[in-house]
Structure formats: structure tokens, C-alpha cells
């Protein structure tokens, strides 16, 4: 959770009250590791400012390890989201260099630790340079934070996407860049939720669509199929 704070005394049922806010990742396949990243936050004496975070998880499909980064950027304004987008890109680019959450040689004291318990289920392999970054980014495609992630538009056509950057799966799969609405801004339809796929995985994008009938949220879910 990006926010996990006491909300005062116990509730009517006697249980502690808490303010909690964060991201959830569910997988049919085993989650091999996860990392929790806090994103830059701005203090505010006006609109409510909440600590935002990103949850990075690794899952192997058909022998290939994928990284998924699930996030929810601030609703405040573009100026407060840009540092968060920059941090997401830093996390992505440095992930292979930082390696697995637990890696390297294991040193234990058998008398104190009772054996080589850290070595049980020790993570192996390398961190994938490719990732899928998805969630509620609270921004439309004409904003600076979107451009940071996908690259600037060129007058010669298309976006100048860096090989270490991301493509917008909705657009890459043939979706209308001006459509795919998932929510609204001031009662105007808007696309705020995305599945960004690292450039190295772009050819794996098979389909991307918005479930317009789902009733579970004030935002509509975005589905992505990789093949």
C-alpha cells in the first residue's frame, strides 16, 4: 500500500480503523517476486494529496519472465504527475542493473540461523528488460506525462519512441487515438487508463480493448492480450 495509516481509534466493531490505498496484482501463474516503489509526492494545503506507488511483479509465461508494473498516478495535475512518470521510467530502465530483490552469494551462520534457510527458494535468473506498465495514469494522451512515456509526436508521422521506452498498447493494436475512453474529466469522456508495453515487446501485442460494460468502478477496465 502507498498509504497505510492509522485513522484514529477502533470502529464500532472494535477493530482498528485504517486509511489504506495502493495497488493490487492478481495472477493465475505464480508471482516470482514483487517490489514496491513509492512515487514522488507533492505536499498540498489545498486539494487532497495522497502517497502514490507502483507495484512491480514478475511472472513467467511459456518459459519467458515478464515484469508487470501496476500503478495509479496522482489526480492533482500534470505538474505533479510528471515526476511520477519520470520515476516509473527510471525504475524500468534500472531494473536489470538492480537485479532480483534477493541475489548473490548467501552467507549464513548455521549455529545462529539453524541452516541455510535463505537459500531455500532462492531467486535465480535475470530481471527482464521488458515490462508491461498498466493502471490509472489520470492523464489524457495530450499531456506531458503521456509524452514522456511514449515519446513525442513527430511532424513526419508517429511518435519518436525510445527503444527503452513504451508504446501505448491501445494505439499500437489499432485503436482510435482519440477514442478508447475509460472515464471522464469534468463530465467529458476521457482516456485515463492504459497498458503501456515496453518497445521490445511491442510485436507481442495481439489485442487491446476497453470493457465498456464492466460495472465495478468509475473507470472502465483495459484488457491486453499478448501473443
Predicted features along the sequence, with ranges:
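Active-site regions of metal-assisted phosphoester/phosphodiester hydrolases
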Residues: 2-227
Amino acid at each position: 500500500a502507498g498509504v497505510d495509516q492509522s485513522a484514529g481509534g477502533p470502529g464500532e466493531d472494535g477493530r482498528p480503523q485504517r486509511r489504506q490505498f495502493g495497488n493490487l496484482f492478481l495472477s493465475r501463474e505464480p508471482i516470482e517476486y514483487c517490489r514496491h516503489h513509492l512515487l514522488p509526492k507533492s505536499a498540498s494545503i489545498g486539494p487532497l494529496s495522497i502517497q502514490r506507488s507502483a507495484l512491480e511483479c514478475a511472472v513467467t509465461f511459456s518459459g519467458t519472465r515478464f515484469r508487470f508494473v501496476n500503478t495509479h498516478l496522482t489526480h492533482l495535475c500534470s505538474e505533479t504527475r510528471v515526476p511520477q512518470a519520470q520515476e516509473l521510467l527510471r525504475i524500468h530502465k534500472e531494473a536489470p542493473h538492480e537485479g532480483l530483490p534477493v541475489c548473490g552469494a548467501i552467507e549464513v551462520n548455521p549455529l545462529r540461523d539453524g541452516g541455510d534457510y535463505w537459500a531455500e527458494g532462492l531467486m535465480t535468473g535475470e530481471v527482464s528488460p521488458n515490462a508491461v506498465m498498466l493502471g490509472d495514469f489520470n492523464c489524457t494522451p495530450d499531456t506531458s506525462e503521456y509524452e514522456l512515456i511514449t515519446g513525442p509526436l513527430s511532424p513526419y508521422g508517429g511518435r519518436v519512441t525510445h527503444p527503452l521506452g513504451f508504446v501505448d498498447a491501445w494505439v499500437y493494436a489499432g485503436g482510435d487515438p482519440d477514442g478508447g475512453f475509460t472515464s471522464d474529466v469534468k463530465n467529458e469522456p476521457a482516456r485515463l487508463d492504459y497498458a503501456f508495453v515496453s518497445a521490445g515487446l511491442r510485436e507481442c501485442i495481439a489485442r487491446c480493448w476497453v470493457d465498456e460494460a464492466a460495472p465495478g468502478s468509475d473507470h472502465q477496465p483495459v484488457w491486453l492480450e499478448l501473443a
